[in-house]
Design a protein with these regions (language model features):
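Secreted/extracellular small peptides and ectodomain modules produced from precursors
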Residues: 1-2, 70
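Short, Lys/Arg-enriched N-terminal segments with co-localized hydrophobic residues
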Residues: 2-21
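Acidic surface patches and DE-rich sequence motifs
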Residues: 6-8, 31, 82-86
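Short aromatic-glycine-(Arg/Gly/Cys) micro-motifs in beta-strand/loop hairpins
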Residues: 21-36
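A short, exposed loop/beta-hairpin motif centered on an aromatic-Gly-Thr core
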Residues: 36-47
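Acidic, low-complexity, intrinsically disordered interaction modules
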Residues: 52-112
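Short acidic DE-rich linear segments
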Residues: 133-136
């Protein structure tokens, strides 16, 4: 459940949050733009998706800095399954305060209970990357 200070906000946010938890979520990742296949990983929460996306991005950068890959043009995101339409759509969530369609923005916001944990995780993962070794 999302954190709130106002009881009336809690009810609206809880309903929206439960809709998201009840929906199916997956991370999609293309490790090299131009390939025809997409790598999918099911996740339980947007925060879990954020951690996985950060891990995949750091891993690709790590391979690039250590000459495992000669170049790296990757892309990824989080999708949610709409059971009514029976199709996958880019993730989004609406709170009383804001409409989020950017996972990074949501995970840094006051609406995300795990914002501090996710920031620490991202720092820990990306501190292994020497960005000066990554070509522009």
């Amino acid at each position: 459940m999302l954190c709130c200070t106002d009881e009336s906000k809690t009810n609206k946010i809880t309903i929206l949050w439960e809709d998201i938890i009840m929906s199916k979520l997956r991370v999609w990742w293309i490790p090299q733009i131009g390939i025809n296949e997409i790598f999918y990983v099911p996740v339980n929460t947007p925060e879990e998706g954020k951690k996985l996306l950060d891990t995949l991005a750091a891993y690709d950068a790590f391979q690039l800095q250590n000459n495992v890959k000669s170049d790296c043009f990757n892309v990824g995101g989080l999708q949610m399954f709409d059971e009514e339409d029976e199709d996958w759509y880019d993730w989004n969530v609406e709170t009383d305060n804001y409409f989020y369609d950017d996972l990074d923005e949501y995970c840094k916001s006051e609406d995300c209970e795990q914002a501090e944990e996710l920031e620490n995780f991202q720092k820990e993962v990306f501190k292994q990357i020497d960005w000066s070794k990554i070509p522009d």
